[in-house]
Amino acid sequence: LYFTWGTNMERYTNFKDFYPYYLSEHSNKTTKLLHFIGTTIAIYLYIRFFMTFDLMYLLYSLLAGYGFAWIGHFFVEKNKPATFKYPFWSFIGDHKMYLEILQGKHKII
């Protein structure tokens, strides 16, 4: 496997500048599809957590969300997830991209 590990050395100081970089790390629609699936499952599990306060649902939501996304990065995009360098903004970016997919701004199939 060939990976591109963080060729972008810029440090982002705001989300507005970060988001185009985030999208560039998600250029393959299969990666976006995997993110969409993982985030959909994670949202369902977040809801289950808040209904039951069972911490296992919170753990499962993180595993689903990051698991699907990281499969896309490591095996489809062949890059390092932005989460490793920008965990908070990547989390926000994933949910923004999710909403944009629902709005039809990104193709996933």
Q: Which positions does each model-derived feature cover?
A:
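Membrane-proximal soluble regions of multi-pass membrane proteins
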Residues: M9-Y22, K78-I109
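Short, amphipathic, aromatic/basic-enriched membrane-interface segments that mark the entry/exit
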Residues: S24-H35
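Helix-coil boundary and interhelical linker segments in multi-pass alpha-helical membrane proteins
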Residues: I47-L58
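Residue-level signature of transmembrane alpha-helical entry/exit and packing/kink sites
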Residues: K32, Y57-S61
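Short, Lys/Arg-enriched N-terminal segments with co-localized hydrophobic residues
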Residues: L1-N8
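Structural signal for membrane-spanning alpha-helices in multi-pass inner-membrane proteins
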Residues: Y46-F49, G72, I101
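Transmembrane alpha-helical segments that form the membrane-embedded catalytic/substrate-channel core
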Residues: L63-N79
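Core segments of transmembrane alpha-helices
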Residues: L34-R48
